[in-house]
Design a protein with these regions (language model features):
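Catalytic cores of eukaryotic secretory-pathway lumenal/extracellular enzymes that build
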Residues: 13, 17, 79, 87-91, ...
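Non-transmembrane alpha-helical segments in soluble domains
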Residues: 25, 32-39, 43, 114-122, ...
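C-terminal cap/loop subdomain of S1 sulfatases and analogous C-terminal strand-loop tails that border
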Residues: 61-83, 98-102, 106, 111-214
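Metal-dependent active-site segment of extracytoplasmic phospho-/sulfohydrolases and closely related
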Residues: 30-66
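Active-site regions of oxyanion-processing enzymes, predominantly non-cytosolic
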Residues: 1-13, 39, 43-52, 83
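Active-site His/acidic residue clusters
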Residues: 1-24, 62-64, 68-72
Length: 285
């Protein structure tokens, strides 16, 4: 669901004083029926046993537009570098391939779906082929995919191929996660609509011990711990790992520079574009 949500009359009518449903419950009922119609089509056309169905979403709850945007138990929400902005549900159905009822807690990114689905279709080497340059028709594609083939993970044959994930908020590297540890470089006390602050000391979190990111320096008002500083000091050596991961990712941008700049929702990016256009015009370009 996404702001502004307009339910069809059938589902809007489900909201009444007796059940106390909000737009969320009625919207989920409509979404459930939409998914059901897709599954029904696959079954009626004999495709359901040989089709991989992935149900997921592109970002965490947009809780600043509540109630449309919903809520999340995780800290933050859409547009932030906190878990609430990135953690999403993912359900995979592929009869005879994906074990029914199996729960996986390994790290998976939305970037992984393309190489995974291509592998399921018969080509497990798409990532390396694109790195070398793959010709399709009259065009050659030479690109760096940041996704991993997770086919062995979803079929129950192996653990996740991914150990790291980069949290990008617009064009800012807000955090990096490596296995259980998350290293956060920014803070957004006002959420997506507020300012982004660069912290002097990266905020270190063990997401297995603190999945809701409640623990930090004790300041008398937030969920902090008087023992956090001591724990942080003993774990500080881990920053060598994040330095290596960021350096490795940065190295790929030399051979494969970004095709376009990231989107920005603040006026500084607009001003920079205007200033560039004015300068180019003055030079006669």
């Amino acid at each position: 669901m996404h702001v502004v949500t307009h339910l069809s009359e059938k589902y809007e009518s489900l909201r009444n004083s007796e059940n106390g449903w909000s737009i969320q419950e009625a919207g989920m009922a409509q979404l459930d029926d939409i998914v059901g119609s897709v599954m029904k089509y696959l079954k009626e056309n004999g495709l359901d046993d040989n089709t991989m169905v992935v149900f997921t979403t592109d970002n965490g709850a947009e809780n600043f537009t509540w109630p449309d945007g919903g809520q999340t138990p995780f800290a933050g929400g859409k547009g932030t570098g906190l878990e609430g902005g990135f953690r999403v549900p993912a359900i995979v159905r592929w009869p005879g391939k994906v074990p029914a009822g199996k729960v996986e807690n390994g790290i998976v990114s939305g970037l992984d779906w393309f190489p995974t689905i291509v592998a399921a279709a018969g080509n497990p080497d798409i990532v390396s082929e694109l790195l070398a340059g793959k010709k399709v028709g009259d065009q050659t594609f030479k690109v760096h995919l940041d996704g991993y083939n997770q086919l062995d993970l979803i079929t129950g044959k192996a653990q996740s191929a991914r150990h790291e994930i980069f949290y990008l908020t617009e064009t800012t590297l807000a955090a990096v996660r490596i296995d259980d540890y998350k290293y956060r470089f920014t803070d957004q006390p006002g959420g997506w609509l507020g300012a982004t602050e660069k912290v002097d000391w990266p905020i270190l979190t063990n997401l297995r011990l603190d999945p809701y990111e409640r623990t930090g320096m004790f300041n008398g008002k937030d969920n902090g711990s008087i023992a956090y500083y001591n724990w942080f000091a003993y774990e500080f050596w881990r920053f060598v790992f994040v330095q290596k991961e960021v350096a490795k990712a940065a190295q790929t941008m030399i051979e494969f520079p970004p095709m376009q700049g990231g989107a920005s929702f603040n006026m500084s990016a607009v001003k920079a574009a205007i200033d560039k256009a004015i300068a180019e015009r003055a030079m006669g370009k």
